[in-house]
Design a protein with these regions (language model features):
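N-terminal beta1-alpha1 cap of cysteine-dependent amidohydrolase-like domains
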Residues: 1-107, 117-125, 129-166, 172
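Conserved G/P- and acidic residue-centered "switch" motifs that form tight phosphate/ATP-binding loops
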Residues: 110
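The feature captures the ABC ATPase H-loop/switch
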Residues: 113
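Histidine-centered catalytic micro-motifs
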Residues: 175-176
């Protein structure tokens, strides 16, 4: 089973990178991890490459990284929107759409979940703090190992009902 993993561009150093843990976990589960850096050559090349790649993989991991260009969901960029890489955005949006069309399993990690949302027509809050929605800093710093984040659940909401009135539960051993 071939599982594609998108990469993150390190502009300061001029290379693509991936979290080695993603590769290790896929291999431990019996899969073959394959890194998927964006194709050079502009938007059309990136979209064509995404189409080709999607037909050759059995699953997709859309990894974390910088912000998505707000122009892709028809908004002006805020000063807080950082680390936008246009080629990556176009490539991953196309990958997400083709994976959806082909009914491939997709795991979106942080930015990856946002890519799936925008690729299928959704929008985003560019910056939760700038929009006045939270005082929590959602931008994780190295070593990028935070495994959880607190969320308040509105009483009586669908989520509260799904959680059976227990919005605060403990993490399983080994998941902390």
């Amino acid at each position: 089973m071939i599982i594609g993993i998108t990469t993150t561009y390190e502009e300061d150093h001029g290379y693509e990178r991936a979290n080695v843990e993603y590769l290790e976990r896929i291999a431990q589960a019996g899969g073959t991890p394959v890194l998927l850096p964006p194709a050079p050559g502009g938007d059309e090349a990136a979209i064509a490459a995404a189409r080709e790649v999607a037909t050759r993989i059995d699953g997709l991991v859309l990894s974390g990284g910088g912000d998505i260009d707000p122009a892709l969901y028809e908004e002006a960029r805020l000063p807080e929107t950082v680390n936008v890489v246009h080629t990556r955005d176009i490539y991953e949006m196309a990958l997400a759409r083709y994976a959806h069309e082909l009914d491939l399993p997709v795991l979106g990690i942080c930015r990856g979940m946002q890519v799936m949302n925008v690729a299928l027509g959704g929008t985003l809050y560019q910056d939760m703090n700038a929009c006045g929605l939270t005082a929590v800093d959602h931008q994780q710093q190295p070593p990028y190992d935070a495994t959880e984040q607190r969320a308040d659940v509105a009483s009586g909401s669908l989520l509260a009902r799904l959680l059976c009135g227990r919005p605060e539960t403990g993490m399983a051993p080994g998941c902390q």
